[in-house]
UniProtKB/Swiss-Prot annotation:
This is Genome polyprotein 2. The viral RNA2 of bymoviruses is expressed as a single polyprotein which undergoes post-translational proteolytic processing resulting in the production of at least two individual proteins. The HC-pro cleaves its C-terminus autocatalytically (Potential). It catalyses: Hydrolyzes a Gly-|-Gly bond at its own C-terminus, commonly in the sequence -Tyr-Xaa-Val-Gly-|-Gly, in the processing of the potyviral polyprotein. Residues 135-255 form the Peptidase C6 domain. It comes from Barley yellow mosaic virus (isolate Germany).
Length: 890
């Protein structure tokens, strides 16, 4: 944490403290060597506590003050108040646990240790002052440097230069907040090099009660109730730790939790990595496989693939406080940089092909182009990164670990060699899995082999060519077997990143200023610049902070199925959605009760439930009420505002609306009405046209409603045709069958059609029946009797006609009742939808906000993006950007 500097006579901020007077008589005082003095001068300049920083507190692991120095300063501010202070408060103590008693002791009997002074620090006897400096305090995390100040006075002149080099490297090697074990190893190393420091006294090392946190004391004294370690010299410190190497206290940090871990030499020239896009090779191949499942012979399918490519990759993968992800298992976890012109140029070619008319590029041609994109890692291995490669190429050091530079460089070379030999195999596997051997693409060009450069030339004979071939074949076979087994092991553990916004971004920064410290606001607020058009919604990074939009979704928490639902919504395939919605609703119900950011899940569940009802109504009746369509559009607009992308070529609501308007079944019902109204040859002509249309539509993909219309229409027309062509003696059953089918047809499809041909046959049959009954009367009857019989026959005929008309009227009343109920549904459903949306909004504003807050947003630096694609799409994530290319509007 902090420590002291020169004992006396410090004035005007002078840094000549090593030459000032120290303890003891001037004739017997110790004097620091000149070389060591200049080294301490440089160390103090680099690691001193800022003048405006709070030097009276110690920060805890949570970054908040955990202790206050000068415990007696508040109790004894004046002589009178000191006399009036209660004696029970003058003893500072805390219970000492068994684990702490191994290394520490209770010092409540020595109250002067907890008093601040301007003279000295103390060692473990609690009485002997320690030679140290009191004019300066070290920064948080570097209080351990106080241990080496007394050692500086014991160094012999012949070891002065070596000890100076040791001091110069000490802060860089240990860094901030080393563990007690690291400090112990450093002391062992110092004693081996400089045995004269063995009996040098050291300041008290104090431990915080109940917490693995240590502090090397200085003139400010010990924090209240902290325990001193049982060591007062270098020898006693080494002996104490050596006898207790199994203690968990050795894992405690020396210092406090100040700035935290970060890249030590990160500057504004590295800020473009924050907004650059990366994607793992596994996620790239998985996204391209999803694109190959889309029907590329349709306009909607091409738009969906274009939008999927727009949203590849993640940003905010690395920044000053966030280390580049570690390289875990297999070359599939390597990150490919998407924000570069070489990748962008290849994607521009695919974009142009997707935007061409359907006649210019067939679906097979587009599939070949998409498969060829899978070879990006093998064609550009120089932009594939692991942690070692990234830190080595950018000369970045994490948390002052300068001693790891050599190992990082060596491991980066090893990673490069592994990538150069494995990327081609990954591409070959991707091609075989995605095309089933149907497509042949260009082999990736040979990758430059990187060789380790030795300090001295290494002479080696030329190996045999046959030996090289044999080794290559054996290695390839073994590698293929191991890789296949490894893929089988990882297949069940595949975890996908949530895809990002507009792709790709290529940024440069010519600024060399240091980045603002954590917690400070940026020098200028993010906004629009003259040469950059920001997307309508902010580009999502990997830090989720909101509670009510797609940014809050943690895919590790939600699971891959939720991401698949988002992808299905983006693709707009109604059949796939209908099958996935029931299971997705059950998953969303679980997420609403257990996951963070559940407000977004609630709104998605409401949308999926409404969409499921609409899809069911569309498939069964080829109809969707205007209220349902309006509800879907309202929810889609709200979800789009919260980060869920919808395809401009057709959201699910638009697809349903278009499907209703272009319904094959409804078109056939209208054609059937036209045929039923005709008679004679006109009926036969229209019936033939209707049957021809039915034969053509059978070859297409039809809904269940369309299938029912085709079957019923075919059966009805066949029955009418049979009734028209049958002999009059056999007319009655066929006519009854045709009329019954017509009534069923009207009931199924909510129509009130009547067949002119069937009505004509019915009237003809009634008249023939009446004439037959009239002709059967006895010839001896009088004319009056004949007239009465004719009158009765006519009355019976009129009653039959009225009965037939009553049947038609009952069908019309049923249709009227159905229309009235639909009207009531259209009126009530918008009210229910508005109420549901209001409840969801109340939940988003209320309950979801009561969760624990997320990490504060960090504004990404401004940059000039290079975009291969732009345009608002419906794919894996959120935003639309405006750039050089735009999708033409129709």
């Amino acid at each position: 944490m902090s420590t002291s500097s020169s004992r006396l006579f410090f004035d005007c901020g002078s840094l000549d403290w090593p030459n000032k007077s120290l303890f003891g008589d001037p004739t017997t005082r110790d004097v620091m060597d000149e070389h060591i003095s200049s080294t301490w001068n440089a160390v103090i300049r680099r690691h001193m506590l800022a003048p405006n920083a709070d030097a009276e507190t110690i920060l805890g692991r949570d970054g908040l003050p955990s202790a206050q120095f000068d415990a007696y300063g508040a109790m004894l501010p004046s002589f009178i108040q000191a006399l009036n202070a209660p004696t029970t408060r003058l003893r500072i103590s805390a219970p000492l646990s068994t684990a702490e008693s191994i290394l520490c002791a209770d010092a409540s009997h020595a109250p002067w240790l907890y008093m601040a002074n301007s003279v000295c620090a103390y060692e473990a006897t609690h009485l002997q002052p320690v030679q140290t400096f009191i004019a300066f305090n070290f920064a948080h995390g570097y209080c351990y440097l106080s241990l080496f100040i007394p050692l500086s006075f014991r160094i012999t002149p012949e070891n002065a230069r070596s000890f100076s080099r040791f001091l110069e490297q000490l802060p860089d090697i240990l860094g901030a907040y080393p563990t007690l074990a690291s400090l112990y190893k450093t002391m062992l190393f110092a004693v081996r090099l400089f045995p004269e420091v063995l009996q040098a006294p050291i300041p008290i090392i104090a431990k915080r009660p109940g917490v693995l946190q240590f502090h090397v004391s200085d003139a400010r004294g010990l924090p209240p109730s902290w325990f001193p370690m049982k060591c007062g010299s270098v020898a006693s410190f080494i002996a104490l730790i050596t006898n207790n190497l199994n203690s968990d206290l050795l894992n405690g940090i020396v210092g406090s939790n100040g700035d935290g871990e970060h890249y030590t030499n990160w500057n504004s020239g590295h800020n473009h990595w924050i907004v650059n896009r990366f994607i793992t090779v596994k996620d790239l191949h998985s996204s391209l496989k999803s694109a190959l499942e889309v029907d590329l012979d349709t306009e909607g399918g091409r738009n969906a693939v274009l939008d999927l490519l727009l949203d590849l990759g993640v940003t905010n993968l690395v920044r000053r406080e966030k280390r580049f992800p570690a390289y875990f298992q297999g070359a599939e976890s390597v990150y490919l940089l998407l924000s570069c012109e070489r990748v962008g140029n290849e994607l521009v070619a695919v974009q142009d092909a997707l935007q061409e008319p359907l006649a210019n590029y067939t679906g097979k041609d587009l599939r070949a182009l998409i498969i060829n994109l899978g070879g990006l890692p093998s064609r550009h291995p120089e932009i594939c990164y692991t942690r070692n490669i990234f830190e080595n190429d950018n000369h970045l050091v994490w948390n002052f670990e300068f001693y790891r530079i050599a190992s990082i460089t060596k491991n980066a070379q090893i990673d490069r060699d592994v990538l150069s030999s494995s990327m081609a195999n990954l591409f070959s596997d991707f091609v075989s899995e995605s095309s089933n051997g149907e497509y042949r693409v260009k082999e990736p060009r040979p990758v430059t082999q990187y060789r380790v450069e030795h300090d001295e030339p290494v002479a080696s004979g030329a190996p045999s060519a046959w030996w090289q071939v044999l080794v290559g074949i054996t290695t390839a076979i073994l590698g293929a077997i191991i890789f296949f087994l490894w893929r089988c092991f990882l297949r069940a553990k595949r975890v996908k990143f949530q895809a990002k916004d507009s792709f790709p971004w290529f940024t440069t920064s010519g600024d060399d200023d240091l980045p603002p410290p954590p917690g400070d606001s940026p020098s200028r607020p993010p906004g629009r610049s003259p040469d950059r058009v920001l997307p309508r919604t902010v580009v999502r990074d990997l830090s989720f902070n909101d509670d009510d939009d797609l940014h809050s979704v943690d895919l590790n928490e939600a699971g891959s199925r939720f991401g698949e639902v988002v992808s299905l919504i983006a693709r707009g395939n109604l059949r796939e959605l209908a099958g996935a919605i029931p299971e997705s609703l059950s998953n969303l119900t679980l997420l609403q009760t257990s996951a963070s950011g559940s407000g977004f899940y609630t709104m998605v569940a409401l949308y999926l439930a409404t969409l499921g009802d609409a899809i069911t109504a569309f498939h069964e009746h080829n109809d969707a009420s205007p209220a349902t369509i309006q509800s879907l559009r309202t929810l889609e607009l709200q979800l789009e505002a919260r980060g869920l992308r919808f395809n401009e070529a057709g959201t699910p609501a638009n697809l349903i609306q278009r499907g209703v308007k272009s319904s094959v079944g409804r078109a056939l019902v209208r054609l059937t009405q036209s045929a039923l109204l005709a008679t004679g040859e006109n009926f036969r002509t229209r019936m033939a046209a209707t049957l021809e249309r039915i034969a053509a539509e059978r070859l297409n993909t039809l809904t269940a409603y369309d299938q029912r219309v085709i079957e019923m229409t075919t059966e009805l027309l066949a029955a009418i045709k049979t009734a028209l062509e049958v002999e009059r003696s056999e007319l009655t059953p066929h006519l009854a069958n045709a009329e019954a089918l017509l009534q069923v047809y009207n009931n199924l499809f909510s129509t009130d059609y009547a067949s002119a041909s069937l009505l004509a046959l019915r009237r003809e049959m009634i008249l023939r029946s009446a004439e037959g009954r009239v002709g059967e009367q006895p010839t001896s009857a009088s004319d009056a009797a004949n007239e009465e019989l004719v009158q009765r026959s006519m009355t019976k005929l009129d009653k039959e006609i009225e009965l037939f008309q009553a049947q038609i009227d009952s069908q019309r009343r049923a249709v009227t009742i159905t229309e009235a109920s639909n009207l009531r549904e259209n009126i009530l459903q918008p009210i229910n939808t508005v109420a549901n949306i209001a409840m969801a909004g109340a939940f988003l504003r209320g309950g979801a906000r009561h969760r624990m807050p997320g990490i504060p947003d960090v504004a990404a630096p401004m940059s000039n993006p290079f975009r291969a694609f732009s345009g608002r799409g419906h794919s894996l994530t959120t935003t639309r950007g405006a750039g050089l290319f735009r999708r033409p509007r129709v």
